[in-house]
A protein has these predicted regions:
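Alpha/beta-hydrolase active-site loop
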Residues: 91-112, 132
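Short beta-strand element of the alpha/beta-hydrolase
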Residues: 47-58
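Primarily recognizes the serine-hydrolase "nucleophile elbow" in alpha/beta-hydrolase
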Residues: 109-110, 115-175
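Mobile cap/lid helix-loop segments that gate and shape the active-site cleft of serine hydrolases
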Residues: 59, 164, 168-221
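C-terminal catalytic histidine-bearing segment of alpha/beta-hydrolase fold enzymes
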Residues: 228-238, 249-314
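Conserved polar/disulfide-associated segments of primarily extracytoplasmic proteins
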Residues: 355-438
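N-terminal cap/lid segment of alpha/beta-hydrolase-fold proteins
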Residues: 20-46
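Short, well-structured beta-strand
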Residues: 423-493
Length: 493
């Protein structure tokens, strides 16, 4: 078993029942007795690299679980999923904005989440709210601690003025009962909260993410630099046949116009997504107003890209590090989840000898890793010694509960590093030892190590290469480990 276990996209690998068991109900406001919680599904790895917050209206958070596999795919890709209901809200008023901020701030504190790694998603009316909230975050950045890096909305009305016109048409048409009932409810609710449209149009415009008839950039201008996606079921034939809705009786015209305005403003990250499959509810009924119009795997891949979440499958290193036959490899972003205190940012690229996990092998615990570090971190013997202690101490600590290691077998992690004669091509070279618990055999162990440093002026990166083995320096394994370094090259741009 390797040091880290990466889980890639697994759309059908985990049954929905498993997610119900792993989903946590989190109370964020003890004073609110009506709707004071959200659902949280941490990633399988426990390593939260990003957060997707899914909002819905007119239902409880639990409603989402059988309707979409977005939480499933996020679970397998180091993304924390938060699901929150916005009750019967149709737009983002001041109270709702404050409530969303309270939820997001609670998530940051509860899960130690990075505020720069949030994406918001909303379904139908909650989608309109997610868009407007994101706009406000960039219109008044000083008032919000979380600024969404991406936002997407599913089958959502983006223009409240046009939504009222839709209500008028549906009530007059009086064809499909569901639409007529919704139109009456929405019309009454918006009139009650914003006033009559004819005399309060400005209130509707201010509350909308977008106003189609505006002659100048409106609220949408604050999405100019934000990745935005709008998802719609564009099967107009079905709308005409079953509900007597033309193209103009859907949310599609306004949604597509919003995306077009963003594209014209220079936002190349704005996308209109036409569903590849017809919208279906979990009960098997055809309905364009469904979470299922989102391709969950593709959406999470998009989120990972926009949130800058490392993916080994698509990683294109700026260096060459060989992989001998039979050796294992793992790559992940720094700092690792088991040693968050490490002052490193960048990528760790690991090479495991074939016998790394075999206690009977001469290659037991023989491995090497490259730290491809951003900028210019402090590197000297003392810093390396402290950081290795944090790294291996955290690694052992993470394995204690997993392997059920009894307390009487634990030993302190002790590191000793010194600077030695600089090897050819190195900026500096170090060597030393790591005394620790071998969590596989559950016995004390001393790892010998050689550390090479090389700076890359072209890429403003630093390469730190660590070689490890419990064998003495005269053992043949060190020749193999050192060969990895001597063949290491930084690619030219």
């Amino acid at each position: 078993m390797k040091i880290l276990y990466f889980v890639f996209v697994a759309l059908f690998a985990f049954p929905r029942a498993a997610f119900c068991q792993n989903t946590e109900k989190v109370i964020y406001d003890e004073k609110d007795s009506t709707n004071n919680y959200y659902l949280a599904l941490p990633p399988r790895s426990g390593n939260i690299q990003g957060v997707q917050v899914l909002f819905l209206s007119f239902n409880t958070p639990e409603y989402i679980l059988p309707e979409t596999r977005l939480p499933n795919v996020a679970y397998a890709n180091d993304i924390l999923t938060i699901i929150a209901s916005l009750d019967t809200s149709l737009f983002a008023d001041d109270a709702l904005i404050a409530r969303i901020s309270k939820i997001l701030n609670h998530v940051v504190k509860r899960f130690s989440a990075d505020t720069s790694k949030f994406a918001l998603g909303g379904y139908e009316y909650a989608g309109n709210i997610a868009l407007r909230y994101t706009e406000l975050c960039y219109e008044h950045p000083e008032e919000f601690s979380v600024h969404p890096k991406a936002v997407f909305a599913i089958d959502c009305p983006v223009d409240l003025v046009e939504l009222m016109h839709w209500c008028e048409r549906e009530i007059k048409k009086n064809y499909f009962g569901g639409n007529v009932g919704d139109a009456k409810y929405i019309s009454n609710a918006l009139t009650r909260e914003l006033g009559d449209l004819s005399s309060n149009r400005e209130k509707y415009i201010r509350a909308s993410p977008f106003y189609k008839d505006g002659q100048h950039p409106g609220n949408e201008q604050y999405l100019k630099d934000v990745p935005v996606r709008l998802y719609y079921d564009t099967d107009i034939g079905w709308e005409l046949e079953t509900r007597r809705n033309s193209y103009y009786d859907t949310y599609i015209p306004d949604g597509s116009e919003l995306i077009n305005r963003l594209l014209l403003s220079g936002n190349k990250k704005a996308e209109f997504i036409s569903s590849k499959l017809p919208g279906m509810r979990s009960n098997g009924l055809r309905n364009p107003h469904s979470w299922s119009i989102v391709d969950e795997t593709e959406c999470i891949e998009w989120l990972k890209q926009k949130l800058d979440i490392f993916d080994p499958r698509t990683y294109s290193p700026a260096y060459y590090l060989s992989l001998p036959g039979g050796w294992g490899v793992e790559q992940f972003r720094l700092p690792p989840d088991f040693a968050r205190e490490l002052p490193y940012k960048g990528i760790q690229d690991v090479r495991f000898a074939p016998g790394w996990g075999d206690a009977k092998s001469e290659e037991y615990w023989a491995y090497a890793y490259l730290l491809w570090l951003e900028a210019k971190p402090l590197i000297n013997a003392q810093a390396l010694q402290e950081n290795l202690k944090a790294y291996f101490g955290g690694l052992v600590a993470r394995n204690i509960p997993v392997r059920k290691i009894p307390a009487n077998k634990l030993v302190p992690t002790v590191t000793a590093i010194k600077k030695i004669k600089t090897s050819d091509g190195d900026t500096e070279t170090f060597s030393g030892t790591v005394s620790m618990l071998d969590y596989m055999s559950q016995t004390p162990m001393v790892l010998n190590t050689v550390i090479h440093e090389k700076k890359s002026p072209e890429t403003d990166h630093t390469a730190l290469f660590f070689e490890f083995s419990p064998k003495p320096a005269t053992h043949a394994i060190w020749t193999e480990l050192n060969k990895l370094w001597t063949e290491f090259r930084i690619k030219k741009r």
